[in-house]
Amino acid sequence: MASAQVVTFHADVAPIIFNECTSCHREGQIGPMPFTNYAEVAAYGEFIEYVTAIGYMPPWSPDAEYAHFVGEKVLTVEEVETLSAWVDGGKLEGNPEDNPGLPDFPDGSQIGTPDHVLAMPEPYVHGGDMTDQYQVFVLPTAFDGDVSIRALEVLPGNHAVAHHAILGLDVSGTAAQMDDADPDPGYEGFGGFGFNALSSFFGAWVPGALPVNYPPGIGRTIPAGADVLVQMHYGPSALEASDLTEVNVFLSDVPVEREVYTAIMGPQHLGAPFVLPPDEVTSFHGTMPVTEDVSLLNIAPHCHLIGSSWLVYATSPDNQDTIPLISVPEWDFNWQGYFTFPFLKKIPQGYTLHGEATYDNTASNPANPNDPPDWVGFGEGTTDEMFFVFIDLVLFEEGDESVALGPPGPCPADLTGDLVVGVSDVLLLLGDFGCLSACSIDLDGDDAVTVSDVLFLLGQYGTPCE
């Protein structure tokens, strides 16, 4: 940025804050303070400068230089420099006419009218004792037969304490029994659902994220009589807070020809027993063969409080080709997510999936639940650990690399699905530049990534996609 440029809130800072921060930092949401106008942002200007400079905010755990995902919240170097220059320049307000205005934050569904709404049977009251709580709620579906769905959408009843949610499926009735045995609504579940559910990762929600909305012909099946499980993470609160979360069910508009399956890499894929000695940093490397051509939709590495990093990728049989999937250099259990690729990502038959996780079981790990550090094994408790990589996939078909998984809208150049055409989209396009056939990105429809695609994107650069 040119040093002579005068940086103001309305012209330069508001577009950054409103697009990347305000979805959480507004009244009734999980952010501890609102960022909806000049006065609110200016009051925390120095704090914003610091947490963005060190990459602590916005909270996005995957390394955006390793792989891109739909809806990623990552500031560019230029945006961070703009925030810093604004603070250093005295936090000038500027001309209100330059302000782009707040984005539209819908109260209800973000993707349409649901076919069914599943609701918690009664409100859950989260205690005002400044602790995190993980509670599993059992939502009966009561479907007469199997149903094919294109989307599940979590609508938290209280955004001020709802931190994230993970969805599962149960057909055994076990979750309902655990619910009945707990005097509170639902039952406590820290690391998972407390038993071997039919699906332990059927979907997820984090603040500001759009639900996964499968392309036509792709979907999932909810079996007849199944219960949808919702593991809610409630963040610390100084006051009691009531929540009544709902799950919107969207049935497939066309017959589902390609069922989404979840591949799970777990401890059985490790070459060593899953044991974490005290006062040591331990790494594990899991591998899983790819026996058919597949296309990946989502990925979610999962461990607990001692976990410190993840790296997931695929390699060719001759180790000459590596497909990056996700890197989480600083794992934070409280900000785990369910990450959707911008386009279906092909992994050819014969490749090998790799999952590398590091665990810091030392006293220097502030998240370590044991003081002093102790031996830790596999389990669902707070003091236990896990090694899982959940990957949603379908069998590969020609043209999959061009099937977009981001939200539909007026901006085909919004490759990362973050609702604005910006630097991250340029970088994603340049990563495929020079492709001449079967390209994962093709904006002008000529089955290649050339200068015309770059010009197409630049023509939409800076466009908000709402």
Feature roles, as predicted:
Residues I30-M33, A162, G307, A438-S440:
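Short secondary-structure junction motifs
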Residues F35, M57, F202-W205, A413-L415, ...:
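Short clusters of hydrophobic/aromatic residues that line enzyme substrate/ligand-binding pockets
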Residues Y50-I54, L305, P317, D432:
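Glycine-rich, acidic and aromatic/proline-enriched surface loops and short helix-turn segments
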